[in-house]
């Protein structure tokens, strides 16, 4: 799947930094573009792939154009194949300004994709060694260097067992939910 996705998306021979999320202030796309500009300056074979849409997309596209990065940034729109796309990516970038949980980080870990997220994302999302947290107070250059540590290839490996141990497995989640409901019903009787 990785090779076919990379071929289909034009990612062969590239270092692909991905993101999925609505184009809103919360997701911090403008900072992502600043980070990517620093990455691209140091490693021109990098590509930034955005999945999603939202009211700030045009502003982000204008920023990309202004920085001369149009040929290296892809706007993929709303996607229903993120699992496959993530398998073709090399790293997932998530510098949110605030976040409830950040479920997309869980999805990235499930396919073995390393993620670099802001330290406002709750620690509970880290179920494997594949998540690094960085302060939003750090510069775009600092973030770029953290990303580039992984440019020489990370082997995607299923993290199903890690996720299962962390409680993200449908059968155990269903049992936990059933137990919770039974406790609630028991209290009302």
Language-model segments: what does each one mean?
Residues 1-10:
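A short helix/loop element that forms part of the nucleotide-sugar donor recognition site in Leloir-type
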Residues 105, 114-118:
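Short hydrophobic beta-strand element within catalytic cores of glycosyltransferases
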């Amino acid at each position: 799947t990785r090779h076919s996705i990379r071929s289909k998306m034009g990612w062969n021979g590239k270092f692909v930094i991905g993101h999925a999320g609505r184009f809103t202030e919360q997701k911090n796309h403008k900072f992502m573009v600043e980070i990517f500009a620093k990455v691209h300056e140091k490693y021109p074979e990098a590509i930034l792939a955005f999945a999603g849409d939202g009211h700030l997309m045009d502003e982000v596209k204008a920023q990309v154009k202004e920085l001369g990065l149009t040929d290296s940034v892809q706007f993929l729109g709303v996607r229903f194949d993120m699992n496959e796309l993530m398998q073709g990516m090399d790293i997932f970038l998530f510098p949110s300004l605030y976040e409830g949980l950040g479920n997309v980080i869980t999805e990235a870990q499930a396919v073995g994709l390393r993620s670099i997220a802001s330290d406002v994302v709750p620690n509970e999302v880290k179920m494997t060694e594949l998540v690094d947290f960085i302060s939003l107070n750090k510069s775009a250059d600092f973030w770029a260097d953290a990303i580039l540590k992984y440019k020489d290839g990370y082997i995607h490996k299923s993290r199903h067992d890690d996720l299962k141990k962390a409680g993200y497995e449908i059968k155990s989640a269903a049992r936990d939910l059933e137990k919770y409901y039974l406790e609630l019903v028991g209290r009302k009787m």
